């Protein structure tokens, strides 16, 4: 298959969730962890997950599904609060394809509940409450791709040990200070 930049959220959305790209990506991450955990020099009882944006979502989802993860690091995670995003009708950010999908394939609104239910299976919020590991969570207040309110909703669902780093003047971008926080977080003794 060829590379793509649009449609990752909506491919397979009107069909079975098993046909959705992000569903397959999540399964791939679990398979990869199983492979890496079998390496001789890997301590498979103390895995760490890290990601930003889509990777931030995958870090949380993966950590919730793999009980060997002891630390999860997530910066402005994507894939959250789909109903809120869909109702905002934002066409220009990372979630824009939801609006386009609705306008092209759900013109009457008849299928809204079905495709939001399918997205519910991928919603990072639903995985956050199942985290058992320590979490370092970066929130960017000015982010247009992963709005602050969706990031906060994920964070508020986490019941395990957690620490947030709030960056009031940052968008969806590299945050050098967060890199320092990651190092400190990984060096902490629990």
Feature names for model-found ranges:
Residues 51-61:
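Glycine-rich nucleophile elbow surrounding the catalytic serine of serine-hydrolase chemistry
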Residues 111-127:
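Active-site nucleophile elbow and catalytic-triad environment of alpha/beta-hydrolase enzymes
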Residues 1-27:
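Cap/lid segment of the alpha/beta-hydrolase catalytic domain
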Residues 145-148, 152-190:
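C-terminal catalytic histidine-bearing segment of alpha/beta-hydrolase fold enzymes
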Residues 41-53:
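Alpha/beta-hydrolase fold nucleophile elbow
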Residues 61-108:
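Hydrolase active-site cap/lid region
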Residues 131, 137-139:
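Short beta-strand/loop motif that positions the catalytic acidic residue
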Residues 50-52, 75-76, 167-168:
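Alpha/beta-hydrolase-fold catalytic nucleophile elbow
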